[in-house]
Amino acid sequence: MGTPCHYALFDLQPSFRLDLDKLATRYRELAREVHPDRFADASEREQRIALEKSAALNDAYQTLRSAPRRARYLLAISGHEVPQEVTVHDPDFLLQQMQWREELEELQDEADLDGVGVFKKRLKFAQDTLNEDFAACWDAPGERDKAERLMRRMQFLDKLAQEVRQLEERLDD
């Protein structure tokens, strides 16, 4: 038995643009149906199947709710498998990465919580813009190479956003 498509689990068509609130609602509905606790009195086989379904559902949800993971998944199911670690060959974006990292280091060194908040808003805007660019690119035939480049940028910004959240938590303590 193969793993069903993440979109199929949620009765969705593969698309980058998703209503994340509806996705979360559907996830909660499905999670209740397959939760292993509901199968406590079932056979060992049924318990194992419930556990597998629950794990597959959780994985699908985590993938679809994350823009970079969703982009990577769409590329993969369309036959454009992308290796996890590939060097980005975009000088402008590499320069932007270095500038963001330097700015984040300065904010950390200065323990500037307000500055981190401003940085976080700019980063969110950059992520939203990149998500829109990917969505438009995804909807255009013949743009898979560009979509892959955009997905890599999305992954970087997502990682940077995680680092910003961690810094914010450290400075807020």
From Swiss-Prot:
J domain residues: 5-77
A Pfam family of this chain: DnaJ
SMART domains xrefs: DnaJ
GO cellular component term of the entry, any: iron-sulfur cluster transfer complex
GO biological process assignments: [2Fe-2S] cluster assembly; protein complex oligomerization; protein folding
Keywords of this entry: Chaperone
Listed GO MF terms: ATPase activator activity; protein-folding chaperone binding
Subunit composition and interactions: Interacts with HscA and stimulates its ATPase activity.
Role description: Co-chaperone involved in the maturation of iron-sulfur cluster-containing proteins. Seems to help targeting proteins to be folded toward HscA.
NCBIfam families: hscB, PRK00294.1
Similarity annotation: Belongs to the HscB family.
Protein name as it appears in the record: Co-chaperone protein HscB homolog
Provenance organism: Pseudomonas putida (strain GB-1)
